[in-house]
Amino acid sequence: MIHTNLKKKFSCCVLVFLLFAVICVWKEKKKGSYYDSFKLQTKEFQVLKSLGKLAMGSDSQSVSSSSTQDPHRGRQTLGSLRGLAKAKPEASFQVWNKDSSSKNLIPRLQKIWKNYLSMNKYKVSYKGPGPGIKFSAEALRCHLRDHVNVSMVEVTDFPFNTSEWEGYLPKESIRTKAGPWGRCAVVSSAGSLKSSQLGREIDDHDAVLRFNGAPTANFQQDVGTKTTIRLMNSQLVTTEKRFLKDSLYNEGILIVWDPSVYHSDIPKWYQNPDYNFFNNYKTYRKLHPNQPFYILKPQMPWELWDILQEISPEEIQPNPPSSGMLGIIIMMTLCDQVDIYEFLPSKRKTDVCYYYQKFFDSACTMGAYHPLLYEKNLVKHLNQGTDEDIYLLGKATLPGFRTIHC
């Protein structure tokens, strides 16, 4: 009897000690990275499993010897230990928090954010609802579809209907060249795409959108080879020396965008572009007359910005949305489903800005000039994929506007 009681006490001590150790390890690891949190979960389960086996093994003799004196107590002890052994922590992945705010920025980026609020280069005077208006994911998709007009400058738009522009703009609407497609991929230029091995998956889509000067050569395994649309900012078209000659800019449909003063119409924007890319645009069209090359209407970025401000928890940078966010909305207009790669960071998250350059800055993930943090909040809210896809692949999945019913 004394021997049995000693065994019971020893088993209880071991149980308490191991549980205490698991809690300590969990608290310490909780401070670590996304990946450490995921590994800890697996280790916790293994420890609990071993703990259950150990407790069951050491108590089996105690239960059998004491069951003759108190059989009900023996069954109760055995049942509780089996329950412990079967317990599994639920799968969870630390991914982008859709309620992120400026409080999540490091001090340097907080200062930049405040500076842009005071600068207000584009003369933003938002008078809409918010900030902090709450939408369900379904309602927000409808709100975007109904209030953000994805359209290109046309030959009938002044001053593009003058003799100065005759023959330069594409005659066909982009809708006759692009889509409708089923599954589409939007491939960011993030440094975390390096070593992702996502190339084959990306190329498996019906259409692929890339940004600015992001290459595929030498990076095929990670980013694929297909380019259906390339969205470029006006700075690249104006200042990139290789733009007129590099074959990178001869593949797929090209779209250039340039920010205007807040909600300016086309004539006002034309008089005061952010970058005067018009001459280079014309030169390119002379060199490559058969290359589809469109100009995004300047109203669209600010229509999107208004919604970002409406739903965000605070004032956002009064600067236009990023090319990444514009590209996502463009593809939601043309596709039934849009898979977005490394816009929401995966476990490969890094301060390396681009997969094809060694340039380090946390602003490339969190945003500085563009309201990138709030754009990521929106995408996370709309995501129909899993947190596991975000964590492992950096993939968010959004439905196209044609597939939703409002």
UniProtKB/Swiss-Prot annotation:
**Which loops or segments lie on the Cytoplasmic side of the membrane, by the record?**
1-9
Glycosylated sites: 149, 161
Keyword Lipoprotein present in the record's keywords: the answer is no
Q: Where in the cell is it found?
A: Golgi apparatus, Golgi stack membrane; Secreted
Q: Which GO terms describe its molecular function?
A: beta-galactoside alpha-2,6-sialyltransferase activity; protein homodimerization activity; sialyltransferase activity
Pathway assignment reads:
Protein modification; protein glycosylation
Q: What is this protein called?
A: Beta-galactoside alpha-2,6-sialyltransferase 1
Q: Which source organism? A: Homo sapiens
